[in-house]
């Protein structure tokens, strides 16, 4: 339960208590239950339409929030995962493969968090090593060779900062991806589904179109990290989140991303099937637009998109 959801938790407890009493004592409490359920829906709408940036950070970090592998079966047909960077080893924190989007062959790449402690250790908490980014690049170059559109799911706190990762060229692998992705001659569409952290997110994020789920975040550093750097106090993360403009709405307003996909009431984890349907429709719509462009136009479109980010006019 998140801090801002405490009022909802209290109502849910009352509903559950009434249901148990109704079953145990064989009394009709349905009217009271209906009233509480209506109250729960109203309160949920009230809370989720007035979320603060720090609230959205908490939602983006939820353990039960859907991951790349949760969405793939709903969006793509006949997905086959491919492994390895052909240089060192496979990286479970970065998954990728081929499949079909409404009959069109596509390449799918995404960061993958774990679902529990054991899985998180296996997936390295969604923080990819250099071999993960090199695997992603291998699949992207393969997609370009066979003229397959590329879809990437961004969901990471950042690239893994460990000693071994640095020894194997973490920064070089990300930088190489930025260079190579900028010149890919196929449509590239990215979506931030959870946290989009720093260079780890950018390593698969140089796309013609970038979308974000309503409660996802995208930033150069975590709010805790920013607070520690700016004010020498990581406990001021909530204040940092307000200042950093890391929410989907703020980034859309700043033209860093192209569109925001609404989430079901209470977050994507409350209705993954509906969320996947919305993502798939957005993918289809964006792909139809990009397929009207030539290979050279796709590259120019991508270059201009990133060239214009951060541009401003002094008056």
Swiss-Prot record:
Which BP terms in the Gene Ontology apply to this protein? fatty acid biosynthetic process; malonyl-CoA biosynthetic process
Q: Name one Pfam family in it.
A: ACCA
Q: Name one GO molecular function term.
A: acetyl-CoA carboxylase activity
Compartments annotated for it: namely:
Cytoplasm
Question: Catalyses which reaction?
Answer: N(6)-carboxybiotinyl-L-lysyl-[protein] + acetyl-CoA = N(6)-biotinyl-L-lysyl-[protein] + malonyl-CoA
Classify the source by domain of life.
Bacteria
Keywords noted in UniProt: ATP-binding, Cytoplasm, Fatty acid biosynthesis, Fatty acid metabolism, Lipid biosynthesis, Lipid metabolism, Nucleotide-binding, Transferase
**Locate the CoA carboxyltransferase C-terminal domain: which residues?**
32-289
* Pathway in which this enzyme or protein is active: Lipid metabolism; malonyl-CoA biosynthesis; malonyl-CoA from acetyl-CoA: step 1/1
* Any GO CC annotation of this UniProt entry: acetyl-CoA carboxylase complex
Q: Which InterPro entries match?
A: Acetyl_CoA_COase_a_su, ClpP/crotonase-like_dom_sf, COA_CT_C
Q: What is its main location?
A: cytoplasm
UniProt EC number = 2.1.3.15
The record's family statement is: Belongs to the AccA family.
Quote the function comment for this protein: Component of the acetyl coenzyme A carboxylase (ACC) complex. First, biotin carboxylase catalyzes the carboxylation of biotin on its carrier protein (BCCP) and then the CO(2) group is transferred by the carboxyltransferase to acetyl-CoA to form malonyl-CoA.
- Relate the assembly described in the record: Acetyl-CoA carboxylase is a heterohexamer composed of biotin carboxyl carrier protein (AccB), biotin carboxylase (AccC) and two subunits each of ACCase subunit alpha (AccA) and ACCase subunit beta (AccD).
Q: Any idea what this protein is called?
A: Acetyl-coenzyme A carboxylase carboxyl transferase subunit alpha
Q: Which organism is it from?
A: Staphylococcus haemolyticus (strain JCSC1435)
């Amino acid at each position: 339960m998140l801090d801002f959801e405490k009022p909802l938790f209290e109502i849910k407890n009352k509903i559950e208590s009434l249901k148990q009493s109704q079953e145990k004592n064989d009394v009709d409490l349905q009217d009271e239950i209906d009233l509480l359920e209506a109250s729960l829906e109203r309160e949920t709408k009230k809370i989720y339409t007035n979320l603060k940036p720090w609230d959205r950070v908490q939602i983006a970090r939820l353990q039960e929030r859907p991951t790349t592998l949760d969405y793939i079966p709903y969006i793509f047909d006949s997905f086959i995962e491919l492994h390895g960077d052909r240089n060192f080893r496979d990286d479970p924190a970065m998954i990728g493969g081929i499949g079909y989007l409404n009959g069109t062959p596509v390449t799918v790449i995404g960061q993958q968090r774990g679902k529990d402690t054991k899985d998180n250790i296996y997936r390295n908490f969604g923080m990819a090593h250099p071999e993960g980014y090199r695997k992603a690049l291998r699949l992207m170059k393969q997609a370009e060779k066979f003229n397959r559109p590329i879809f990437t799911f961004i969901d990471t706190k950042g690239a893994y900062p460990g000693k071994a990762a640095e020894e194997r060229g973490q920064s070089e692998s990300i930088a190489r991806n930025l260079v190579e992705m900028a010149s890919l001659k196929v449509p590239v569409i990215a979506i931030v589904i959870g946290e989009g952290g720093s260079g780890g997110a950018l390593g698969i994020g140089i796309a013609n179109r970038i979308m974000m789920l309503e409660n996802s975040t995208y930033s150069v550093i975590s709010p805790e990290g920013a607070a520690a750097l700016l004010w020498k106090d990581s406990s001021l993360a909530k204040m940092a989140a307000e200042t950093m403009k890391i929410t989907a709405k703020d980034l859309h307003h700043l033209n860093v991303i192209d569109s925001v996909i609404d989430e079901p009431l209470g977050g994507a984890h409350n209705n993954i099937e509906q969320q996947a349907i919305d993502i798939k429709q957005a993918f289809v719509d964006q792909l139809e637009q990009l397929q009207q462009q030539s290979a050279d136009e796709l590259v120019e479109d991508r270059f201009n998109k990133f060239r214009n980010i951060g541009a401003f006019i002094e008056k």
